Structures are given as C-alpha cells and as structure tokens.
Amino acid sequence: MKLAFILDPLDSIKIGKDSSYAMMREAAVRHHQLYTLQQNDLAWKDHQVIGFARPLTLLDPPEGDHRWYEEGAIEEIPLSGFDAVLMRKDPPFDTEYIYSTYLLELAERQGAYVVNSPRGIRDHNEKLAITEFPRFTPPSLVTSQEQLILEFLAEHEDIILKPLDGMGGAGIFRIQNTDHNIGVIIETLTRYGTRTIMAQRFLPEIREGDKRILLIAGRPVDYALARIPKPGETRGNLAAGGTGVARPLSARDREIAEELGQILYARGLMLVGLDVIGNHLTEINVTSPTGMREISDQTGTNVAGLMIDALEQNIARKNR
C-alpha cells in the first residue's frame, strides 16, 4: 500500500510516545510505502487535489528523536494516487486546519481515502462533540457570557474552564467560588466576552487519572491510558506533566466506548480518543489521538497493529 501521513514537522515528533510514528513503523514492517506531507503541502491544481509529498524511510534502529528517518525528493502526487491519506496534524483547529479539511474533502470526491474523514473532523469539535451524548457527560456550559459562567460556578462551586480549540491541557483553569481572581480568568479566557469557552463541573476523580480510550474502526482497545496529574496539578495531560498508566477498561468505560464507537465510525472517524474522568465523558479527540505507544509498551497490545489491520481491511473493501 501507498500511505501518506499529513503531520507536523518530523523533527518535532517524539518517537518514544508518538502514535503517528507507531503507525508508520507498523506500516513499514508490513512493507507499505510511506510518504509525508505537512499541511501547507496540500494544493488544488489543474482541477485536482495534490500533495507535495516526500517518500519516507524509517531507520532501524532509530537514532533518537532527530535521527529516525530519511526523506526522498519531493514528488507532486494527486491524493487519489495514495491508497490512504492519514490526517495526523495536531491542533490548534484554526482556519488553516479548516481549509485543509475542505481540500481533503475535495480529494475524497476524486477517489482518495482519507482517515479520519475531513468532514467528520470538521463536524466534531473535540470539546463540543460531547454535547451529543449528555447521559455520559458532567454538567457543562458553553458560552462567552461572564454572567452565565458565574451562575454555573455558584451552582457547582468548583469548575473547570477550557478553550474550545486547545490541546494538551493548554489554557485550562480550575476555579472555585472562593477564589479572588475569578473575573480576571473569565475575562482572559473569553477575551472579554468575545470568545466561546466550555465550563464543566470539576471532577475529583481526576486524581485517579484522565483516561484516554482509543476507538479503532468503532471498537475500543481493551486498555485505557490513565493520565495521572503531577502533585498540585488538576490536568492529567502528558503535555502538562502527567504520568500515563495503562489500565483495563472498566464496565463504564466500555459502555461509553461501545455506544459512541459505531456512531462515530459511521461518520468516517476511524481513530478516536475518548477522554473519560471517573464515569464521565469529557472530550472526543478526532484530529490526532495519541496514547498508542504507552498502552503498547505497558501491556504488550500492538495498538498500531490494530489500526493498520483495520486500514488494510478498509482499503481492500474499497478496491473490490
């Protein structure tokens, strides 16, 4: 197979924990051809969507985060010329990201197979998407109005505020009704009422970990990655200093995953990361879900292998 990965700059990838690297490594073991692009390598030219792609060879063994690959010369290739195009660009989900999804959707119409679906990515903001599944979510509020946030705080006394377009725990604040800088935090996050944010009731179960549950082709991986906050921190994100511990799915984890899995897969979302704190769904990650390496290293489950298995099966069905 000929696979194209749309990624952040390769030198920014930490191969010891990066899920895109895990998938590329698994694909290389199976002798699939690898190509990489960045977001700005996509173009509409001569009535088709093309990519300025570089052939990628993975070094075996890798020699660290900055010496694990070799790239060939740039090739101009229609996206329909790949067996699959995997969109793995990290947020922020800004206007450039949106434009990329439009180009990728055009490529789909020309026969390209894009994972995850560009429309699916665009339609599922990673914070807002949980509002479709209220029976699994904590009390939540989406607004730019300070008064509504203050009323929500008065009701729940201890809440989390987060931007709708962040990642890795960036811009997340916990506030309690006894704090003295509440107004400043709200003004900063909402940019004086001009930016919509999400508020959620604080879940003390975060101390036991913010669980990342991976869905592959609608089915949950048997282990979640519980991201445990460092002392004094309320964010479990690994980027915020959390520690990842693989754990078997609980009955509630599986209930959430199995209900959402087939719904999201039917929308073209083949690889999804659900974030669950305690018994509550807090986010649905569809851009570039992570956690494969940590789960695989700790449990022996080849998560990237499950993903490439599913990808091969879907490509075979598409080509029949």
Swiss-Prot record:
Q: How is the cofactor bound?
A: Binds 1 Mg(2+) or Mn(2+) ion per subunit.
What keywords appear on the UniProt entry?
A: ATP-binding, Glutathione biosynthesis, Ligase, Magnesium, Manganese, Metal-binding, Nucleotide-binding
Q: Catalysed reaction per UniProt? A: gamma-L-glutamyl-L-cysteine + glycine + ATP = glutathione + ADP + phosphate + H(+)
Gene3D superfamilies with a match to the protein in the record: 3.40.50.20, ATP-grasp fold, A domain (3.30.1490.20), ATP-grasp fold, B domain (3.30.470.20)
| KW Oxidoreductase (keyword) present | no
InterPro entries tied to this protein: ATP-grasp (IPR011761), ATP_grasp_subdomain_1 (IPR013815), Glut_synth_pro (IPR006284), GSHS_ATP-bd (IPR004218), GSHS_N (IPR004215), PreATP-grasp_dom_sf (IPR016185)
Single GO term (MF): metal ion binding
Which pathway does UniProt place it in?
A: Sulfur metabolism; glutathione biosynthesis; glutathione from L-cysteine and L-glutamate: step 2/2
Residue ranges of every copy of the ATP-grasp domain listed in the record:
127-312
Q: Which cofactor does it need?
A: Mg(2+); Mn(2+)
Q: Provide the binding site for ATP.
A: 153-209
Cellular component GO terms, alphabetical:
cytoplasm
An example Pfam family from this entry, by short name, is GSH-S_N
Q: Which residues bind Mg(2+)?
A: 283, 285
Q: Is Glycosyltransferase found in the keyword set?
A: no
| Enzyme class of the recorded protein, top EC level | ligase
Listed EC numbers: 6.3.2.3
Family affiliation = Belongs to the prokaryotic GSH synthase family.
In Swiss-Prot or TrEMBL terms, this protein is called Glutathione synthetase
Its organism's taxonomic lineage begins at: Bacteria, Pseudomonadati, Pseudomonadota, Betaproteobacteria, Nitrosomonadales
